[in-house]
Curated annotation (Swiss-Prot):
Means of activity regulation: Stimulated by the activator protein Act which requires the presence of magnesium ions. Inhibited by 1,10-phenanthroline.
Pfam families listed in its UniProt record: ADH_Fe_C, Fe-ADH
Protein name according to UniProt: NAD-dependent methanol dehydrogenase
GO cellular component: cytoplasm
Function: Catalyzes the oxidation of methanol to yield formaldehyde. It possesses a NADH-dependent formaldehyde reductase activity and cannot use NADP.
Native source organism of the sequence: Bacillus methanolicus
Class of this enzyme: oxidoreductase
Catalyzed reactions: methanol + NAD(+) = formaldehyde + NADH + H(+)
Record EC number: 1.1.1.244
Length: 381
């Protein structure tokens, strides 16, 4: 039996952000708390969204304190503001950091306690505060998922919180919000989306439904990510990547992830590194480890990513997937290893132990020991 989770409503395309006030009104909201980061707030985007909400006859407050790799401290501060402002809905603006922060605020505001109490799978008892997630980057897919990743500031460990109840009520994906994003951010978020599609396609929980989303996401990313990097104002490329990251998010939300994310959660949490780049660095090494478990699928991935596999055996074609990922990293100027990013060999044991315990490890296609994971991280240095 397959369970499939997706936001009850999704609005995708140019100008979609103008739907926010109408959508909030439809779900019965009276006052929304906008959750965003300081930079997006400084651009005036949150005020534009707030204006749209007010024009729909609703009240609004703004919490512009979402941060990369959001921590429990920001979540709890947001919960306090949500309650002080007497809000009954949340609007997140940004990428995964804003969306995950809003999901976590909505969870704790409705269920009590601390976000740290909800680490793991299906630990949420009551319905959460509705979230309208407005995406400004093509990468995390967080607007589609039942996952929030929050850093435990005391333990310096990323805590995945997974529960269908935290899936946003409405996902808004507007490519016009993605134009003019710098190439570096486009690369990091685009490679994050690619990692979602690849891991979902080979995950233990993959189904024909998730396969369809993952395959189409890989096709679009292979064609349009280089174009979006080369010209951030290419609206066709931005729109294609908007759809790709949405589909990749749906795929991994229902099919699962794997060691790419288990490892990057730890590396990013300890060293405060960009999530998409952490994924990119370890992805060739994780895929090399997983090849024997999903050889035919990796052969297909190689083809989807532009490798010529004609005349090759399935095993040889599968290895071309690793070549493709290394090509992506080289072409996009991604560091060749974690050492360049400041990761220290003496931390590998702790990183591997925490990655082994990460919930994403459960859906990796090949069973891995702590020692296996340590070797993968060492290879990625």
């Amino acid at each position: 039996m397959t369970n499939f989770f997706i936001p009850p409503a999704s609005v995708i395309g140019r100008g979609a952000v103008k739907e926010v006030g109408t959508r909030l009104k439809q779900i019965g909201a009276k006052k929304a708390l906008i959750v965003t980061d300081a930079f997006l707030h400084s651009t005036g985007l949150s005020e534009e969204v707030a204006k749209n909400i007010r024009e729909a006859g609703l009240d609004v407050a703004i919490f512009p304190k979402a941060q990369p790799d959001p921590a429990d401290t920001q979540v709890h501060e947001g919960v306090d503001v949500f309650k002080q402002e007497n809000c009954d809905a949340l609007v997140s603006i940004g990428g995964g950091s804003s969306h995950d922060t809003a999901k976590a605020i909505g969870l704790v505001a409705a269920n009590g306690g601390r976000i740290n109490d909800y680490q793991g799978v299906n630990s949420v008892e009551k319905p959460v505060v509705p979230v309208v997630a407005i995406t400004t980057t093509a990468g995390t897919g967080s607007e589609t998922t039942s996952l929030a990743v929050i850093t435990d500031s005391a333990r310096k460990v990323k805590m995945p919180v997974i529960d269908e109840k935290i899936t946003p009520t409405v996902a808004i994906v507007d490519p016009e919000l993605m134009v003019k994003k710098p190439a570096g951010l486009t690369i990091a978020t685009g490679m994050d989306a690619l990692s979602h599609a690849i891991e979902a396609y080979v995950a233990k929980g993959a189904t024909p439904v998730t396969d369809a989303f993952a395959i189409q996401a890989m096709k679009l990313i292979n064609e349009y990510l280089p174009k979006a990097v080369a010209n951030g104002e290419d609206i066709e490329a931005r729109e294609a990547m908007a759809y790709a990251q949405y589909m990749a998010g749906v795929a991994f939300n229902n099919g699962g992830l794997g060691l790419v994310h288990s490892i990057s959660h730890q590396v990013g949490g300890v060293y405060k590194l960009q999530h998409g780049i952490c994924n990119s660095v370890n992805m060739p090494h994780v895929c090399a480890f997983n090849l024997i478990a999903k050889t035919e699928r990796f052969a297909h991935i190689a083809e989807l990513l532009g490798e010529n596999v004609s005349g090759l055996s399935t095993a040889a074609a599968a290895e071309r997937a690793i070549v493709a990922l290394e090509r992506y990293n080289k072409n996009f100027g991604i560091p060749s290893g974690y050492a360049e990013m400041g990761v220290k060999e003496e931390d590998i044991e702790l990183l591997a132990k925490n990655a082994f315990e990460d919930v994403c490890t459960q859906s990796n296609p090949r069973v891995a020991t702590v020692q296996d994971i340590a070797q993968i991280i060492k290879n990625a240095l």
